[in-house]
């Protein structure tokens, strides 16, 4: 079981994060500063991956990544309105709040690793589906490569039958690059 992250560790991380990265939406900075100013709220804050699966989750992104600037999830509703989410945070201080931060080199950051918690709300079969997707992609890549190789071999045979040295050399080069 993972050791709970202390309020001070979370605050230190947010300070570090705000000093090193610029969020795409200024309201995100306001939300993080508001959370830091209330220890009771910080106790309910959890930094996780895939916050869209959480009962109450926020996704915030910095300028250095391509992900969406801001999203707030509550139950089955999603909004990009930061003011609505801020209002919800103030009214529901007793509820857990799961925050996903998208920033460059997030997974190489010891500061982030120190506060990142396992997301208890990720569906159990999600990773199974991801594994299946990876295997399917590998099978597809293998099938395409096999098809291309067989096609080139047929074309090489035809070039040899025609005694077309130029086509043979071109096709043989393509075959060697494929391997």
Curated annotation (Swiss-Prot):
InterPro entries, per the entry: IDEAL_dom (IPR014957), UPF0302 (IPR011188), UPF0302_N (IPR014963), UPF0302_N_sf (IPR038091), Virus_scaffolding_prot_C (IPR027393)
The organism's place on the tree of life at top rank: Bacteria
Protein family (similarity comment): Belongs to the UPF0302 family.
NCBIfam families (UniProt xref): PRK03636.1
Protein name: UPF0302 protein BLi02393/BL02764
């Amino acid at each position: 079981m993972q050791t709970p992250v202390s309020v001070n560790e979370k605050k230190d991380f947010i300070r570090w994060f705000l000093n090193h990265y610029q969020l795409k939406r200024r309201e995100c900075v306001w939300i993080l500063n508001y959370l830091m100013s209330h220890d009771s709220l910080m106790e309910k804050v959890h930094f996780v991956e895939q916050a869209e699966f959480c009962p109450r989750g926020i996704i915030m992104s910095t300028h250095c990544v391509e992900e969406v600037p801001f999203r707030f999830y509550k139950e089955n509703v999603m909004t990009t309105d930061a003011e609505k989410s801020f209002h919800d945070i103030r009214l529901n201080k007793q509820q857990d709040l799961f925050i996903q931060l998208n920033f460059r080199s997030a997974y190489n950051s010891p500061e982030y690793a120190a506060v990142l918690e396992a997301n208890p709300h990720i569906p159990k079969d999600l990773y199974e589906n991801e594994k299946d997707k990876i295997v399917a992609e590998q099978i597809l890549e293998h099938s395409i490569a096999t098809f291309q190789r067989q096609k080139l071999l047929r074309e090489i045979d035809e070039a040899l039958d025609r005694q077309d040295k130029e086509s043979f050399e071109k096709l043989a080069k393509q075959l060697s690059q494929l391997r």
